[in-house]
């Protein structure tokens, strides 16, 4: 049995893969693959409409929010967000992980050419991002602020800002990179001005980025780039140019699968259960360590851990691969191991990994 712990692209629900396989050569008796049909066809319009409606239902997205299906990966949003929201304003960044740092760096780069200010509220980098940054509201000028950007789940470092810990402001919008825990943790969309997420972790396959934006944040002023203008993209129903049709189709199937599992809250409960199995073993062990300082900040999607030495870490991932536990090697910037246990990852895979971890500890402690 193979268990894919990849951080993204990552495991997909078997039911979704089978449906893709079943329809690949003949989509809805059209005689064509879904990869071949026009994005302007009635058949594809139905696909994207259903995907949007299902996502709106799953996340209880209010009607005053627009949903976009875009290309470019979540990293493209590091530029699009300040270009659309921060002109003439101050953009604040909470840097608690490598991707938050990249988002801030991109805003700083844009500030050299555009009328905007990118302001870091601080960073936990000196501590290897092993905890989240506590936000000092006294540093924020809400009146002239565009937004506060944060990452809800740090895929590399294994930390999360859960719903109960989100900062609240009277008027400053929250912008969230939700790439690695969207649909895995139940967030109240109305708490955010804008949410974006790459699809290849919990939503489907690489090549698609979802953006959820509150209508009042759409910019009517002429922008630097039509392709990166939320207003234009909304007006064109995500079809200003040819969208990533196959990735949208797969995401739509994933949304239906999430509904069939009972929705986001049910999956969050299962994700907590899976993560707790690993954290319980790590906490009770003298062999394994989890570097996250505060237990209430531990991710339930990406569980990071180390053994007593780098040599043992390498041996662990090697032996794990031989046993069918794939992609457990930690990110190159952190080392150690990382078990990415997104929505589609089965509980039995975590149970089997825990057994293997116990056996490895017995053999090498």
Curated annotation (Swiss-Prot):
Homodimer. Its EC number is 2.6.1.52. It is found in: Cytoplasm. InterPro entries: Aminotrans_V_dom (IPR000192), Aminotrans_V_PyrdxlP_BS (IPR020578), Pser_aminoTfrase (IPR022278), PyrdxlP-dep_Trfase (IPR015424), PyrdxlP-dep_Trfase_major (IPR015421), PyrdxlP-dep_Trfase_small (IPR015422). One of its GO terms (molecular function) is O-phospho-L-serine:2-oxoglutarate aminotransferase activity. It comes from the Bacteria. SUPFAM superfamilies: PLP-dependent transferases. Its cofactor is pyridoxal 5'-phosphate. It catalyses: O-phospho-L-serine + 2-oxoglutarate = 3-phosphooxypyruvate + L-glutamate; 4-(phosphooxy)-L-threonine + 2-oxoglutarate = (R)-3-hydroxy-2-oxo-4-phosphooxybutanoate + L-glutamate. L-glutamate binds at residue 40. Pyridoxal 5'-phosphate binds at residues 74-75, 99, 155, 177, 200, 241-242. This is Phosphoserine aminotransferase. Catalyzes the reversible conversion of 3-phosphohydroxypyruvate to phosphoserine and of 3-hydroxy-2-oxo-4-phosphonooxybutanoate to phosphohydroxythreonine. Binds 1 pyridoxal phosphate per subunit. The modification N6-(pyridoxal phosphate)lysine is found at residue 201. Signal peptide: none annotated. Pathway: Amino-acid biosynthesis; L-serine biosynthesis; L-serine from 3-phospho-D-glycerate: step 2/3. It is an enzyme of class 2 (transferase). Keywords: Amino-acid biosynthesis, Aminotransferase, Cytoplasm, Pyridoxal phosphate, Pyridoxine biosynthesis, Serine biosynthesis, Transferase. Belongs to the class-V pyridoxal-phosphate-dependent aminotransferase family. SerC subfamily. GO terms for cellular component: cytoplasm. Its main location: cytoplasm. One of its GO terms (biological process) is L-serine biosynthetic process.
């Amino acid at each position: 049995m193979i268990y894919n712990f990849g951080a993204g692209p990552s495991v997909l629900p078997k039911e979704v893969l089978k449906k893709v396989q079943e329809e690949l050569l003949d989509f809805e008796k059209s005689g064509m693959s879904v990869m071949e049909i026009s994005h302007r066809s009635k058949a594809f319009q139905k696909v994207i409409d259903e995907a949007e409606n299902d996502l709106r239902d799953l996340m209880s997205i209010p009607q005053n929010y627009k949903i976009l299906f875009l290309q470019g990966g979540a990293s493209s949003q590091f530029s699009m967000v300040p270009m659309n929201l921060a002109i003439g304003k101050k953009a604040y960044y909470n840097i608690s992980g490598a991707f938050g740092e990249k988002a801030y760096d991109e805003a700083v780069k844009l500030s050299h050419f555009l009328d905007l200010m990118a302001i870091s509220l601080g960073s936990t980098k000196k501590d290897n991002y092993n905890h989240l940054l506590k936000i000092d509201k006294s540093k924020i000028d809400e009146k002239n602020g565009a937004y506060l950007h944060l990452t809800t789940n740090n895929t590399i470092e294994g930390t999360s800002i859960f719903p109960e810990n989100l900062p609240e402001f009277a008027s400053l919008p929250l912008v969230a990179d939700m790439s690695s825990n969207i649909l895995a943790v139940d967030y109240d969309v109305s708490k955010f001005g804008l949410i974006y997420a790459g699809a290849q972790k919990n939503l489907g396959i690489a090549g698609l980025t979802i953006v959820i934006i509150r209508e009042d944040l759409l910019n009517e002023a002429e922008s630097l780039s039509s392709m990166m203008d939320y207003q234009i993209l909304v007006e064109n129903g995500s079809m200003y140019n040819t969208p990533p049709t196959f990735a949208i189709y797969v995401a739509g199937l994933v949304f239906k699968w999430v509904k069939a599992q009972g929705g986001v809250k049910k999956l969050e409960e299962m994700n907590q259960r899976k993560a707790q199995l690993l954290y319980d073993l790590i906490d009770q062990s003298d062999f394994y360590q989890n570097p996250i300082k505060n237990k209430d900040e531990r991710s339930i999607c990406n569980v990071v851990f180390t053994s007593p030495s780098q040599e043992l870490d390498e041996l662990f991932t090697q032996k794990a691969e031989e046993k069918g536990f794939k992609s457990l090697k930690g990110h190159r910037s952190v080392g150690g191991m990382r078990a990415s246990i997104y929505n589609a990852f089965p509980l039995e895979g975590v149970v089997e990994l825990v057994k293997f971890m116990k056996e490895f500890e017995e053999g090498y402690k």
